[in-house]
Amino acid sequence: MQPLANRFILGSLLLVGVEFAIAQTTAPAAAGSGIKGKEIYDARCSACHSVDDNRVGPLHLGVLGRKAGGVKSYSYSEALSKSKVIWSRETLTAWLSNPEALIPGQRMGYAMDNAQDREDVVAYLATLKAIK
């Protein structure tokens, strides 16, 4: 009876180990850092975007809570202008991951591969509150 109990225990431990390994590889990124996000934004986003001014892409001041395509002074693609997306942490993260999947027909030709970088940039964007 003892060998059967040992096999059961070993099998259970193996299963727990496999589940732990899977959880580690599919775990979501940690909460974003606005400080790190600003560094990433300055390095990767500022060629096309600015906090205060439109460039190749629209300004980002007050982006959280704004309708996609909602900066009146910027000329958006038809797809983005007609979109019903409201920028939230979730939609911004999805956008940075794959803009075309979120809003087909948009014009942004950049995606951020690293999940933690996306979380950090979104944390930074969340700090850019428009003055009302």
PLM feature spans:
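Bacterial N-terminal signal peptides that target proteins for export
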Residues: 1-12
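Processing junctions and N-termini across compartments
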Residues: 17, 39-42
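N-terminal signal peptide c-region/cleavage motif recognized by signal peptidases
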Residues: 17-18, 26
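Electrostatic cytochrome c docking/interface patches
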Residues: 23-40, 132
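Gly/Gly-Pro-rich "capping" loops immediately C-terminal to redox-active cysteine motifs
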Residues: 34-38, 50, 54-89
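The canonical Cys-X-X-Cys-His
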Residues: 41-51, 121
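Short secondary-structure junction motifs
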Residues: 45, 55-57, 103-105
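C-terminal capping alpha-helices of c-type cytochrome domains
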Residues: 88-132
